[in-house]
Amino acid sequence: MRTRFRRSMVRRAAFTGISMVLLQVGAGAEGMYGPFSEYAMSQESEIALAKSAAPGSISTHATIEVLTPRGYEVAVKGDRDFICMVLRGWSAAPDPVDTRSAKIRGPICFDSVGARTVVPAEELKAKLGLAGKSPEEIGHQVALQYGLGKLPKIEGAAFAYMWSASQRIGPDAGAWHPHMMVYVPYYENRFLGNNPVGNHTAPFAVGEGTPYCIVMIAVDDRLAIRAGER
């Protein structure tokens, strides 16, 4: 069980780790994502799940984006700069085949920097996935758009909450520990002491040394939030 969650956590890190896209473009299996109907949720359920990613002091003031047949669209306009949304499997493109399950749900809330610099990439990946692009095509297009300067670069450090206890990080896995994701360009795991990837007792870096490195910091399991609970 511990090994399965460690592997699933690493896959989930790639949901918003553009570094994983750049490292794996051209790799892996073939196949398209399913139609929108396989990823759809009721708006009420998706809003509740998105909000479960962060404490109420943040999520109640955040803008909430939900998935539609056209991609992510604003369902609730917040009064702060946070954006909360529920990521789907294409956020990990072009990662391993099991991240392509339509069952995957990754609630996440981005701070103002992440809202400006990470969310646009997630919105693009959703549109490409819904347009029938393969995981490899999505990875290529995202990398290309970054290279052309059409997607914004991460400014300094961006923070994201992933505290939901209702997340689903793989077809046969549930939630990992609630944690923070810190987007720190060019950071390296050795700066943290080379902690093992998937370790919930110490921070570790995913996509280290790239412009899109993420430091994962697990928090107390008692902070996990179930959708609809506050």
Q: Positions of the model-derived regions?
A:
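Primary mode marks residue(s) on the alpha4-beta5-alpha5 output face of response regulator receiver
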Residues: E30-R230
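Bacterial N-terminal signal peptides
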Residues: A13-Q24
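An N-terminal RHG(E/S)-centered segment typical of histidine phosphatases
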Residues: A27
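N-terminal secretory signal peptides that target proteins for export/translocation
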Residues: M1-R11
